[in-house]
Amino acid sequence: LDQGRYTVAAGATGLVRACRDASVKYATERKTFGVTIGQHQLVKEMIAQMESDYQASRLLWLRSGWLKNQGNRNTRETGLAKWFATVASERAAGDAVQIHGANGYSDEYPVGRFYRNCKGGVIYEGTREIHKLMQADYLLGNRVDKEPRCALPAYREVLKAR
């Protein structure tokens, strides 16, 4: 499951970035009351949240991948990256649609598609609720990972074999 969760975290992180980029572009072009909507405080807040979520999601999944490349078990870290990034993607997609207003539902802009696509990541490879429980169990000492039945070699070992 770790590999799938890692992939979901990476995809969700990309979705946060796409929502951020589309929202920044729209906020600098769309005008209301004589100013771009990016000048409005709550639009700024939503865009700032997207940036924060993107940076945190990116660091979590990169750390998870780094651990895997070192040959270390990364179930805890991958679960956290998947949980955080998918929740962030759902929030970013909702905010992106909000920033775009009625245009958020239009096929002219990609954010409506982002909003539809984000939900899958929240559900598959373990729902957000399952990942919350897993993280709590790690902290409370109720969960300890067993040795994997089989594992891919560390990436550095793959490079040495070439």
Can you name each region flagged by the protein language model?
Residues 1-162:
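Alpha-helical interface subdomain recognition
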